[in-house]
Amino acid sequence: MWIEETDNGKFKFRENYKDPYTGTWKPVSVTMEKDNSRAYKAARKILEQKITEKIAQLKASELLFTELLDEWWTFYKKELKRSSVASLRGNIEEIRETFGIGVKVVNIDPKYVQNYLDNLDCSRNKKERNKSMLNLAFDYAVGLDIIQDNPARRAKLPRVKKTLEDWKKAEEKYLEEDEIKPLLKELYRRPSTYRLGLLAEFISLNGCRIGEAVSIEPCNYESKSRILQLHGTFDHTEGYRNGEKTAPKTLASYRETIMTSRELEILQELEFMNELEKNTNHRYRDMGYLFTTKNGVPIQTNSFNLALKKANERLEDPITKKLTSHIFRHTLISRLAENNVPLKSIMERVGHADAKTTAQIYTHVTKKMKSSVADIMENY
């Protein structure tokens, strides 16, 4: 650092710094009233701050989007559960390979993001997820003062126009009473799927997610009060044998429900069955959960869904809807809606924080409600 006296009697403190990208030396300066040790110390501090800011600005202006994405993803992963990281990893890889390759972050504008979204050849859900990831990555950049505005949040996805096919799909998300009864009966008919029948019936009565159901432990329910604690979900990222119970994704999912007498019977029956296996089956591994295979490992979602499909194929009148664990959860929502239970109460029961998810099913009236309207008009 050196000092130059100005024409007006003040003192200009100067310093040079090296541009990390060009290798050239560039000047910074600050003018002080006096030339003494106190002014010297103050000037040095100011110049160091200026140099730090200028280098940061240079680095920000040169930062490539792929570098930003990697930096943000490393940070964001720390907030996520292992299952969420595994679920999102594919989206992150796709964005890295298709968006902003070799492009500086500061050069990406809303139009650039819009063109990317418009040209994505994938499902609506995948587009929404990719846009959500871009929103978060650019939010991170705004927070670090790399950019002033988030271009992804200004880009838009077109509103989805509902078609007759969409309405038909929505109505196929749940089972009617004349559909669920024969399906459960078929699951209970075979010893190999009996436990799966208990799981299917339990979800249809409680409305919990399959991950929540298979993470239920004996200590999570109380017989006298019939209170069930749903305080977690089963994370099988490392495989079901190495899985563990983890906290739910949202606060709304952390809940307690009052069980029906049938729900209580199912849990008690499972406790009895597991205790029997523990004492007679040398392959049984006690992992502490209720909804397990006969060997003690929590029931796998894929195996459960496959068993549903095969059981349905054996029915005299197979169900034409896509059968997964979620259809039983949705069935409870439709039943409660059919009985005029308020939307808020249904949301609390099934652990939904967003009314949209429940409302999609809530608004699709079941056959019973449709027929009751017809009966009223018939007698009008």
Regions found by a protein language model. Give the residues of each.
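N-terminal core-binding DNA-recognition domain of tyrosine site-specific recombinases/integrases
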Residues: 35-36, 74-146, 191-194, 298-303, ...
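Basic, Lys/Arg- and aromatic-enriched nucleic-acid-binding interface segment
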Residues: 124, 128, 143, 147, ...
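Short, polar N-cap/turn motifs at the start of nucleic acid-interacting alpha helices
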Residues: 221-227, 341-361
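N-terminal DNA-binding module of tyrosine recombinases/phage integrases
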Residues: 7-12, 17-107, 111, 275-284
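Short amphipathic helical patch at the helix-1/turn junction of helix-turn-helix
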Residues: 132, 203-204, 337-338
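Short, basic (Lys/Arg/His-rich) helix/loop patches that form interaction surfaces
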Residues: 187-196, 257, 273-282, 286-289, ...
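Conserved tyrosine-mediated DNA breakage-rejoining catalytic core shared by Y-recombinases
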Residues: 14, 215-275
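DNA/chromatin major-groove-contacting recognition/catalytic segments
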Residues: 239-245, 339, 360-380
